Amino acid sequence: MEKATQPRAFYGSFFHAPAYGSFEYLERALIEVGEDGAIERVIAHDDPDQAAALAKAREAGTLYELGEGRFGLPGFVDIHIHSPQWPQAALALDEPLYRWLDERTFPLESKFADVDFAKKVYSDLVDQLLARGSTTAMYLGRAHLEATVALAEICAERGQRALVGKTVMDDPAANPDYYRDASPAQAVRDTETLIREVEAIGRKSRAGAWPVITPRFIPSCTDEVLRGLGNLAESTGAYVQTHCNEGQWEHDVVLERFGKTDPYALRDFGLLREHSIMAHCPYLTEEEGEMFAELGVAVAHCPTANSYFSSAVAPVQRFRSQGIHVGLGTDISGGYSPSMYENIRQAVLVSRLLETGVNAQLPPEERGGLGEGTRLSLVESFWLATAGGAEALGLPLATFEPGRAFDLQVIDVKRPDSDLTGFGVFDEPIDRLARILYLSTPDNVRQVFSQGVLVCDKDAR
């Protein structure tokens, strides 16, 4: 698709959330995009320059018009995905975590030693994510180097911006013999190789690709490998991702092993730093949160997966008030859906439960709710899925502002089987946005652009 002539001016009505807690509706705006896929200018409909700019783009054949009944949203930024778990999405989520891992996840992930199998799965996963508007994705590949490099190549070929890590899990006492790193030294060497190869892919990728240092989580790793990965993070400045304070079991294991909690252990191994993305974190204390903010550590909030396997809700509003960067993750396949729309909805839902508590057999004051100021609004959740994820990654994207990468999903609200028009009732911009975020199906997402290039076109099918 990149070889075809690409639009350089996009005319229509757009929603975005450039600031936490608010959104902007850019009605009949013209967005001009440079050859590099970055936004150059946003011209409002009442700007006297718009008519001339529209005419110029139309004459040059570079104008794209969204059309009636269509709206533009920024591409989503999904900052926590287990790429090899895609074949088990939606499976065994009613089982305990240990059974889900031992009987499903580890046997499945071990199959990715077969690179042909890995490419088949990863190609479908990336296509499915793009079809749902996710133009940026942060992946945990698995313990196989070649398959993980192949994932980065597939993302680059399809136009998805990707941050890719080879998961490290080397402790013989904690991981199955058939699926673990051969040694701490080999795990670090493989991660060094991954960094070189993904950086090379990124230099050729229009949207970009970045390597990520990825210990699975502390219980699966030896001290030696955690120390080695921390040193590698220091020397390379690469992104870091892992699970942190995900559940009570993890918390207890780390505390018994080190005499300190998960965040402090990760810090002492050199794995908490700017561009570290910590997934889940519902058990993060206020003191630990202050440390995150001071170090520039970000949280990947995974509301669906937390409900299944953390038995807790992350206090996102507290994180934000402490100055912690927070984005949103689907957490395939601890989260069943590849859709960020679903996780936007779930983030709002679980925050309401955190606000009030859930045991109706107890008096309200004893239900464990955190009270007023805990709930997320839909607009705040939309921000988490777009600008919040971009902020967590430190990348200029996910809003319609000059200098930002132009990532666009075109939403058709008049699809025959998914009509979001609302019959002309409650038709303010916030109502239109709410219908899009709550009711959209993949069929409503008609076209997706990444870095200014068309990467998904359902209208052409």
Task: Outline where the language-model segments fall.
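N-terminal metal-binding scaffold of metallo-dependent hydrolase/deaminase domains
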Residues: 1-61
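C-terminal cap of metal-dependent C-N hydrolases
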Residues: 19, 405-460
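Alpha-helical scaffold segments that flank or form the walls of functional sites
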Residues: 70, 89-160, 190-205
